[in-house]
Design a protein with these regions (language model features):
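Bacterial N-terminal signal peptides
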Residues: 9-22
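Intrinsically disordered, low-complexity proline-rich regions
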Residues: 7-9, 148
Length: 315
């Protein structure tokens, strides 16, 4: 995959410059702030019926300050474009191999607006078996059994960063479904200070990429190490939560019996996403800003990244 320059695109109703890092930078930032954008998922607090959310129902806060919401568009119809990478750990055990039919079924059920890519985690890199394509049968054909060699992928977070950095920019939503044990053999685990995990989260946030993660045991000794698998699942939960995605399966006696219910949940989330644009507070320097996207619509909750990389306002 090759990342190109900084093309102008019309996105969410205004002209923006999409950089090679995925930052949305202001072309003519006014006194109201710096235009930025993100993908937000709506979910039901109770039950399965997700309420419809309108722009007037959305609030964006940076700290104690309220930001102006300039656009809120359902990711449907002409705005439904999605690029979805399925990123599989080549060091996974036999459990992942039993899930390939579920993954093929999921891929073949995707709408025409979704392009699916396949990649494998190997030695800290993402080996792309199929670039995102609208030919879902071609994407499904790229699935194969994992190598199943313990340590084949020493850090899933190196691989995630590698995928994110080499993923060409697009006006479509970009999201990842990664299946791995989450164990970072480069760092060793045992706390939440893993710098490679932090870097992967930062890379995904800068690119505006949402990550979904499901635990599947690795091959070899680590596949039945309780404390390693505990921390691996904590890491997966964190990368998903901080990027606005979801993590699946907390267990220590093997992987999930079937991926199907988790894939169905992810599909439901993809079907209830919105394209949000708002004016962030002008800053003198590029930097991270913590944000919170909320709504007061009954039985509705908005899920998004916890922070955004906001470019400095033009001087």
């Amino acid at each position: 995959m090759k990342i190109t320059g900084c093309p102008l695109k019309v996105l969410f109703g205004f002209a923006v410059c999409v950089s090679a890092t995925g930052i949305v930078c202001a072309q003519n930032a006014g006194t109201n702030g710096v235009p930025v954008h993100m993908v937000v998922t709506a979910e039901a607090r109770h039950g399965s019926d997700v309420p419809e959310i309108s722009q007037r129902d959305v609030m964006v806060n940076e700290g104690h300050d309220r930001d102006e919401v300039t656009s809120w568009i359902p990711a449907k119809g002409d705005n439904a474009a999605l690029e979805l990478f399925i990123l599989l750990d080549d060091g996974s055990g036999i459990n992942l191999g039993t899930q390939l039919d579920s993954l093929r079924k999921f891929i073949m059920a995707q709408p025409a607006s979704t392009k699916v890519g396949i990649a494998y985690m190997q030695n800290g890199t993402a080996k792309v078996a199929q670039s995102p394509t609208g030919d879902h049968a071609l994407a499904a054909k790229a699935l194969r059994l994992p190598m199943g060699a313990g340590g084949a992928n020493a850090s899933p977070y190196f691989a995630l960063s590698d995928l994110v950095k080499r993923w060409p920019e697009s006006a479509a939503r970009r999201e990842v479904f990664m299946a791995t044990d989450g164990i970072d053999l480069y760092y060793g685990g045992g706390d939440l200070q893993d710098p490679y995990l932090d870097a992967a989260i930062d890379d995904a946030l800068r690119a505006g990429i949402i990550v979904y993660a499901i635990y599947t045991p690795g091959a070899g000794h680590v596949g039945h190490s309780y404390w390693q698998n505990y921390w691996g699942q904590m890491y997966l939960s964190r990368v998903a939560d901080e990027t606005g995605g979801e993590s699946y399966y907390i267990g220590f006696t093997g992987g999930p019996v079937r991926f199907d219910p988790y894939l169905e949940d992810m599909e439901n989330r993809l079907d209830h996403q919105y394209l949000l644009a708002f004016n962030a507070k002008p800053q003198k320097k590029n930097g991270w800003q913590r944000i919170k996207v909320t709504t007061e619509v009954p039985n509705a909750e908005l899920v998004s990244a916890h922070r955004m990389w906001v470019p400095a306002a033009p001087q």
